[in-house]
A protein has these predicted regions:
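C-terminal helical "tail/cap" subdomain of flavin- and related membrane-associated enzymes
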Residues: 118-120, 135-218
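A conserved FAD-binding loop/helix module that cradles the flavin
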Residues: 117-127
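Short, cationic motifs built from Arg/Lys/His that form the positively charged side of catalytic pockets
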Residues: 56, 104, 156-157
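C-terminal structured domain segments across diverse proteins
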Residues: 105-110, 124-125, 133
């Protein structure tokens, strides 16, 4: 199962202090923005760009100028710019293989599923796969539970699809889409207000972002 998103992320890494100590997700009519801290002196920034863009066409100056356009004034005034250490464009896609096992061949991580990075679920889901398979193999080798080997795909996929759903939801919530109607934009804005202003909405995002509970294996 695959869905390719109609945009990518242009990322820039720089030895500049982060604009904010906490991660920033921002929606703007020109496209999504993400600001992240790698250390107290190193920052990573991302801009939503069309898939047709070439990284060679983005000078550092152009990147910083566009980032400032998309950030609110209180952040723009604190932004420290500098020479980039690395720039790249990553296409976004959602992808899941079913089943995640063939006999005694088990698929884990990117071999079985890919998520857009908006929900920060890629590494979490890979660790979840490892955790499920480790517990199953422990029961098999220590207690002879051969019956549990067939349960890996079901257990892993249940969590994978929930992670895919959250990444899909966050991507749709925060990005600008080609040929988006004004009605679509109004609905998207209403969604953002709900999830920012409602305790239930905030709880839903927090629960999924931190990570849903693992199922029992045996």
């Amino acid at each position: 199962y695959e869905s390719v998103w109609p945009f990518g992320w242009l990322g820039l890494l720089a030895d500049t202090p982060p604009v904010n100590p906490e991660l920033i997700y921002a929606h703007h009519e020109r496209g999504f923005v993400l600001c992240s801290q790698r250390s107290l002196t190193r920052s990573r920034y991302y801009l939503q760009v069309p898939l047709s863009e070439k990284v060679e066409e983005w000078s550092d100056e152009r990147f910083w100028t566009e980032l400032k356009r998309r950030l609110p004034d209180e952040l723009t005034n604190k932004l420290v710019t500098g020479h980039s250490l690395e720039k790249s464009i990553a296409p976004l896609r959602s992808y899941v293989v079913e089943p995640m096992q063939y006999g005694r061949l088990f698929l884990l991580g990117d071999a079985a599923h890919i998520v857009p990075p908006t929900g920060a679920k890629g590494l979490n889901l890979a660790a979840s796969d490892v955790n499920y398979l480790w517990r199953i193999l422990r029961e098999y080798y220590h207690h002879g539970r051969i019956d549990l080997l067939a349960s890996y795909s079901r257990l892993a996929l249940d969590r994978v699809w929930k992670g895919e759903r959250f990444s899909w939801f966050m991507t749709r919530l925060l990005h600008d889409f080609p040929q988006q109607s004004e009605f679509d934009r109004k609905m998207q804005a209403a969604d953002r207000r709900y999830y920012l202003e409602s305790r239930a909405g905030l709880t839903t995002i927090a629960e999924n972002y931190v990570g849903l509970p693992m199922e029992r294996v045996a």
